């Protein structure tokens, strides 16, 4: 189902973390030219739970990224199995939510997506859980105990949460954009660590659409993040901020409705311009290049079309460390399907520079 990227075994190399949704969760490392699962511990594999979403960040400030697994065994409302927050001690993995002191803050509401947020800009992360049919959660660790801070931070909203991203959208702190179903989107402006929903004011509420995939991208290449938002069988959006409101500048080909599930924005071919990959379910995927001045150019895919693919998630990483990003697409939902892994054909003259910001605890500075 969902996919994230982290260095789970602290060997200096990234792994793809893939949720199983009734099948084992995977930690896929690049070994001898192949992707291989490197973790076999039951608490991580979690075969009996319907794991749908995943995010990684250092929530306990020890320099190692914990893994948040979002479980959903019902469509909406109360669920049977709670989420997991996987930590490591001497190469043994365990679930922080299973500790007695953390049980009162279990998330027992169905959800879809999860994202890490450095709300104070100090490297101390919280985890935003986009729930469906119940209040949003925002977990932090205080005094070595998991605490839900959503109500305190004005985040405990009830909606059909679908997709969520965090970054410097409006302020110099981490803001949050949440694409929702059967309700307005949220644009959560960071005000000194607390949040205010300004989606209506900035014209990104998109209330009649049903959000699915979303990503942040510098569409105008001007040094600020814009919003890519995909709607289920609805018009997709390329929101750029102009005169204190967002405008959709996507062309007809980009905006055209589809059964979208995931949006990825990255420079796949190392030419200095970002591409946007749209993963659709049971219809062809699409790829666009963002040229100068935010002009979207559709690139006709020969591979990665997946016309009969039941895509549910995707992520990018230079998993083999050759300077070219790999794209991993996960599948599932109504039908079990294998993972797919893609790489662009890159011109020899194209160059790359990879930067990995580190915070004061020695962990990846996500959202920097």
Report the location of each language-model feature:
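Acidic/hydrophobic-patterned starts of short beta strands in beta-sheet-rich repeat architectures
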Residues: 10-19, 61-70, 121-130, 171-179, ...
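Gly/Ser/Thr/Pro-enriched helix-cap/hinge segments flanking short amphipathic alpha-helices
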Residues: 145, 242-246, 295-311, 320-368
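Short loop/turn motifs that recur once per blade in beta-propeller domains
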Residues: 38-49, 96-108, 149-159, 198-208, ...
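Beta-propeller blade termini
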Residues: 1-10, 50-61, 111-121, 161-175, ...
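Beta-rich catalytic cores
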Residues: 23, 50-55, 81, 110-112, ...
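Asp-box/WD-like beta-propeller blade repeats and closely related beta-sheet repeat scaffolds
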Residues: 48-53, 72, 78-119, 152-155
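Short consensus segments that form the blades of beta-propeller domains
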Residues: 17-18, 44-45, 73-79, 105, ...
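Beta-propeller blade repeat segments, especially FG-GAP/WD-type strand-to-loop junctions
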Residues: 24-38, 79-98, 135-149, 184-198, ...
């Amino acid at each position: 189902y969902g996919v994230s990227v982290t260095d789970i075994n602290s060997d200096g190399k990234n792994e793809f973390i893939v949720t199983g949704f009734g099948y084992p969760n995977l930690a896929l490392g690049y070994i001898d030219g192949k992707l291989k699962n490197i973790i076999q511990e039951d608490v991580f594999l979690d075969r009996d739970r319907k794991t749908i979403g995943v995010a990684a960040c250092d929530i306990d400030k020890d320099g190692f990224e914990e893994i948040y697994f979002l479980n959903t065994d019902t469509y909406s409302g109360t669920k049977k199995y709670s989420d997991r927050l996987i930590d490591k001690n001497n190469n043994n993995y365990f679930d922080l939510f299973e500790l007695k002191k953390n049980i009162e803050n279990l998330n027992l509401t169905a959800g879809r997506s999860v994202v890490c947020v450095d709300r104070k800009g100090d490297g101390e992360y919280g985890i935003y859980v986009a729930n469906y049919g119940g209040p949003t959660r925002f977990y932090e660790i205080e005094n070595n105990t998991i605490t839900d801070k959503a109500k305190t931070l004005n985040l405990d909203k009830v909606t059909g949460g679908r997709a969520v991203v965090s970054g410097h959208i409006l302020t110099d702190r981490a803001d949050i954009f949440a694409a929702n179903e059967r309700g307005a989107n949220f644009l959560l402006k960071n005000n000194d660590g607390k949040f205010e929903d300004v989606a209506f004011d900035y014209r990104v509420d998109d209330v009649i659409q049903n959000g699915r995939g979303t990503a942040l991208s510098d569409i105008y290449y001007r040094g600020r993040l814009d919003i890519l938002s995909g709607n289920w069988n609805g018009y997709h959006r390329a929101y750029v901020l102009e005169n204190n409101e967002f405008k959709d500048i996507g062309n007809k080909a980009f905006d055209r409705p589809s059964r979208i599930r995931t949006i990825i924005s990255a420079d796949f071919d190392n030419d200095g311009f970002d591409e946007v990959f749209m993963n659709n379910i049971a219809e062809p995927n699409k790829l666009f290049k963002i040229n100068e001045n935010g002009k979207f150019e559709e690139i006709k895919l020969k591979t990665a079309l997946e016309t009969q693919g039941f895509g549910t998630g995707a992520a990018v990483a230079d998993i083999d460390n050759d300077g070219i990003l790999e794209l991993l697409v996960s599948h599932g939902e109504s039908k079990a399907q294998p993972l797919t892994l893609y790489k662009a054909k890159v011109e020899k003259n194209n160059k790359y520079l990879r930067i990995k910001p580190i915070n004061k605890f020695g962990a990846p500075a996500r959202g920097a």
